[in-house]
Amino acid sequence: DEVIVLEASSEEGEALNLVNEIQELAWNRGFEYKDIAVLYRANFQSRVLEESFSQHKIPYRIENGLGFYNRPEVKKLLDYLRVISDPNSDAGDEALLSILNVPTRYIGRKVITQLEEEAASKGVHLYEALKSFRPDTPFIRKNVRELVAFLEPLTQLAHTLQPAEVINLLRNNLDYDRYVTDEDIPTPDDSKIQNLNQLQLAATRF
């Protein structure tokens, strides 16, 4: 077959072109989805493709990599959003455990167990217990206080702030870009930074 070149004015348009081509192959030309491969230049570009494929119920599998929303730097920011939007829930508990040490706060397994036990004894969720939690070690206690002081205003404003605004606040106030890249001055072409930019761009739609 001849090579076909399609132009698109946006990432979304490019993804829709791909969806149309895949549907044509699968519906009208006798191909199965497993016969079709999509190549892209950089990992951050998968976000729009994954969302478009999901919306159009096209099954896909990413070879030798993680789906966009499962990449660690993306997943941890989403966990922060879950804590902020719904702190006192089972989902909030799971998300809080995920971000306690993001960035590093040296909160070890023993301290986490103490927090879980305190929450259970009070019959509350982990975030509620965290607000009055007093670890024995002064340094850890200070880190816990700072985390609560950071999260609490955001939980109060969760329904007034836009998701993209919250992501921007998290990235700036936690120095998150430097944390995930382990670089003093993260560069825009770093794949993790590109993933975070894609997440923030996606969040502007909500």
Language model regions located:
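Helical mechanochemical/support elements of P-loop NTPase systems and associated helical scaffolds
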Residues: 11-14, 18, 32, 42-45, ...
